[in-house]
């Protein structure tokens, strides 16, 4: 019912944790499209100053995330939301590993992914950017001043994701970071 966490996501978690630990005082974190909850749980366990909330559209994913939360003795708050639909408050950090594979590319994925992973966790629509567009558009109203977004991206999506963020004219200091294999893997942007 959830995407199996992979090594690609480690950079996203590391960068978010490094930032959160650098902030003096408490940090409210929203994990958008939480899936198994691994990102939210890692941040909660490793950042004493973080208060973590995690949302997902899938009730089945939330059941798994809550089980993982209990198994890891974490204190993440989970609730169902179609992106920001049920999100009412503002956060200091939004972290997201949304579905980002183009619909037409799903059939060409490795069997271990295509057959065993839930389609909902993979399919980013025809251009793979559906969730980035929505989060960039609506995210600003759910971020406090100096808020920051951390996105995991597909290896070939850097420029498209940066362009759509810049187009919103709500963010500054938008940049990417490469993973251990020299692929662009995350995009980071701050409230302007």
Locate the predicted segments by residue.
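Mobile active-site "lid"/loop adjacent to the S-adenosyl-L-methionine
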Residues: 100-130
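Class I S-adenosylmethionine-dependent transferase superfamily signal
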Residues: 16, 43, 113, 135-139
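Short glycine/threonine-rich catalytic loop with a Thr-x-Gly-x-Asp
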Residues: 5, 35-36, 180-183
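Conserved SAM/SAH cofactor-binding pocket of Class I
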Residues: 11-108
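Conserved SAM-binding loop and adjacent beta-strand
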Residues: 2-14, 130
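Conserved Class I SAM-dependent methyltransferase catalytic core
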Residues: 126-190
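C-terminal beta-strand of the catalytic ATP-binding
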Residues: 100, 190-192
């Amino acid at each position: 019912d959830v995407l199996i966490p992979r090594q690609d996501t480690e950079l996203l978690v590391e960068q978010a944790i490094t930032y959160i630990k650098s902030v003096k005082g408490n940090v409210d974190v929203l994990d958008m499209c939480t899936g198994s909850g691994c990102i939210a749980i890692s941040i909660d366990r490793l950042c004493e100053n973080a208060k973590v909330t995690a949302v997902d559209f899938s009730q089945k994913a939330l059941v798994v995330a809550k089980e993982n939360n209990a198994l890891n003795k974490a204190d993440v708050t989970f609730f169902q939301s179609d992106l920001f639909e049920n999100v009412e408050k503002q956060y200091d950090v939004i972290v997201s590993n949304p579905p980002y594979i183009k619909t037409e590319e799903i059939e060409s994925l490795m069997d271990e992914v295509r057959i065993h992973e839930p389609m909902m966790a993979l399919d980013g629509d025809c251009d793979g950017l559906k969730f980035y567009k929505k989060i960039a558009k609506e995210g600003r109203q759910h971020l406090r001043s100096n808020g920051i977004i951390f996105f995991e991206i597909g290896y070939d999506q850097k420029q498209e994701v940066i362009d759509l963020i810049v187009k919103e004219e709500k963010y500054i200091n938008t940049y990417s970071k490469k993973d251990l294999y020299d692929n662009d893997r995350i995009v980071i942007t701050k409230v302007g």
